Amino acid sequence: YRKVEPFMSLSKAALNMAEALRPVLVKLIPQKMLSAVKAKVIEKGAKDLEKTEITPFEPQAHKKGINLIGSIKSDTGLGQSMRLVAEILENSTWDYTVYDYFVPPGGSRTNEAFDGKITQTGPYNINLIHVNPSELPLAFMDVGKKQWDTRYNIGYWLWELEEFPKEWLPAFHLLDEVWTPSEFISQNLRKYTDKLVYTLPYSVTAPADAAYDRDYFHLPKDRFLFLMMYDSGSGMVRKNPLGAIEAFKQAFDRENKQVGLVIKMNRSEQSEKDIENIRTKLDGYDNIYFI
């Protein structure tokens, strides 16, 4: 551990400095090169995680409760996922607090639903870490080893592909068990670890705003509509909207006026290539809608 901790501290300092200097760096160095350097730091940190000795769980060392760690304010699917988990805790008998961890600049972060639960400390004996394995080394550097020690550490992960990147395997070392929202993800992760992997689906409530009806989105009122939505930042290959379009085409012909498929892309302005790729697949289907 003594050999690993200095690297973690230096890596965290380097990343923080890089983010502080981002406005200057992006003018001098190509974004692709900056991303590559950051990826190297994360990769080195991930490898060193396997050498880090986490003090085993001591139930009585801290108060009973849950420290929920992740980007609770993020206006993304991952942020909403964390808020759904927080909503479950809010309606349970468990004491909990939120540590708002994110990788700067963090994108749009305007959600204030759980601002009242955010603290800079994690006083409870369970860490529920809503951070995907690709960023877990950064979270470990940011939160610190002390927050991991003597606590029961649970990762809540989302990864919808069957193959799990080998460079992420060291992330398992930091956890006692893993939770996922679907059995598909759980089955895939169990192939890579002997640690417990549980499926805990979301508890979803969906309050509707009457202003945002089908007329608002220029969608037909008299059709059964399927919805496929994703964030361009999550990658087209991973979210697979083209697969949804192909499945719809196989199930229904272009003249079918009883059904429709709605494709909704978040942050579409950041991926014109994705939009063009999707439009080429619409192929004259008037019952496929893009919003």
Task: Kindly give the residue locations of the regions a language model identified.
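N-terminal pre-catalytic "stem/leader" segment of glycosyltransferase-like enzymes
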Residues: K3-V131
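Extended catalytic core of nucleotide-activated donor transferases of GT-like folds
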Residues: E50-T55, N67-I69, D100-N188
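Short hydrophobic "strand-cap" motifs at the C-terminus of beta-strands
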Residues: I69-G70, Y156, P181, L200, ...
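Conserved catalytic-core segment of nucleotide-activated headgroup transferases in glycan assembly
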Residues: Q80-I88, Y96, A206-I291
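Residue-level recognition of beta-strand->loop/alpha-helix junctions
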Residues: D100-F102, P201, I263-M265
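Donor nucleotide-sugar binding/catalytic pocket of nucleotide-sugar-dependent glycosyltransferases
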Residues: D176-Q187, D194-D209
